[in-house]
Regions:
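Short proline/glycine-enriched turn/loop motifs at strand-loop junctions of beta-rich domains
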Residues: 11, 20-26, 106, 115-121, ...
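Short, solvent-exposed loop/linker segments at the N-terminal edge
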Residues: 3-12, 95-107, 190-202, 284-288
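Surface-exposed, short loops/turns at beta-strand junctions within beta-sandwich domains
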Residues: 45-53, 140-148, 235-243
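Flexible, low-complexity linkers/stalks enriched in Thr/Pro that connect modular domains
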Residues: 69-94, 164-177, 182-189, 259-277, ...
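Asp-box/BNR beta-propeller loop motif
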Residues: 34-38, 129-133, 224-228
Length: 288
């Protein structure tokens, strides 16, 4: 147990031993299981004791019938596992797509145990290899590197019985995700150039490829040269003439974000000024 001298123990088998009594005297060993209210004779060998509180004393009787008693020895036999309680991650800011998955950018938080057996000793353990090995750690977790962390608490009662909490898993991820490449699917790039994205086409789709698996994608559009951005959909339909900037924001499970390169589209369905055609340098001979 926690103390090596308190005689609170898991040990159910031990012997009574008396030394220094009067030579030739008779010794009677007594035990009480009700805090000394009643006593029963017992043997030197204590074997397979049930959990409980045991008081022991020896009564020494000399040849004349005089008696004396030893001091009482108290033993608490306890083989019951203690309440382990519940381990939580106090102050953890669970960033990202889910607020309950404990995949996070947060590198600083505390371990917190509640509901464990009163008077027990708590040891906090951490594993960084998916539970193959465990090392002792502290309540305060600070400046953690990116990685997968598993935590548990081992609760030890006064008799040395132990129990463990459920494991808490935390994924610390501060790395920006792959944004991938944003393209304009089905865009018909009309006009003089087939690659300048100046077009009469008012209907096309946004398409993102190569982004981090499992990430969340938000598509944004700007119609004021990037000063402000609004969320938009994949399908761009019946656009008015104007300049459109598009980008995709990729958010991973931990809440890290990255942006694609901007795609610029100029929608122009207005007929150009035709101007006036003349015949320059024409020598208009004849009557008129």
């Amino acid at each position: 147990g926690i103390s090596a001298t308190d005689q609170i123990t898991q040990d159910k088998n031990f012997n009574l031993k008396l030394e220094g009594q009067e030579s030739g005297s008779r010794v009677t060993y007594l035990v009480s299981t009700d805090e000394g209210k009643t006593w029963q004779e017992t043997t030197l060998n204590q074997k397979d004791l049930a959990d409980g509180i045991y008081l022991y004393k020896a009564v020494v009787t000399d040849a004349a019938g005089n008696t004396s008693e030893t001091a009482v020895q108290k033993v608490v036999v306890d083989t019951t596992t203690p309440h382990s309680g519940e381990l939580t991650l106090s102050d953890l800011n669970d960033t990202g797509v889910s607020v309950t998955d404990q995949i996070t950018q947060d590198k600083n938080f505390n371990l917190k145990l509640e509901g464990q057996e009163t008077g027990s000793r708590v040891t906090y353990l951490v594993s960084t290899d998916e539970g193959k090995t465990w090392q002792e750690t502290t309540v305060v977790q600070k400046d953690l590197a990116d990685g997968i962390y598993q935590y548990k608490a081992v609760v030890t009662d006064a008799a040395g019985n132990t129990s463990e909490t459920a494991v808490q898993k935390v994924v610390v991820d501060t790395t920006t995700p792959q944004a991938g490449e944003l393209t304009l699917s089905d865009l018909s790039d009309t006009g003089i150039s087939a690659t300048d994205q100046i077009t009469q086409d008012k209907n096309f789709n946004l398409k993102l490829e190569g982004q981090e698996s499992g990430s969340r994608v938000t598509y944004l559009v700007s119609t004021d040269e990037g000063k402000t951005w609004q969320e938009t959909t994949l399908n761009q339909k019946d656009l008015a003439d104007g300049i459109y900037l598009y980008k995709a924001v990729v958010t991973d499970a931990a809440g890290n974000t990255s942006e694609t390169a901007v795609q610029k589209v100029v929608v122009d369905t207005t007929t150009p000024h035709s101007g006036e055609l003349t015949l320059s340098d024409l020598n208009d001979t004849g009557v008129s």
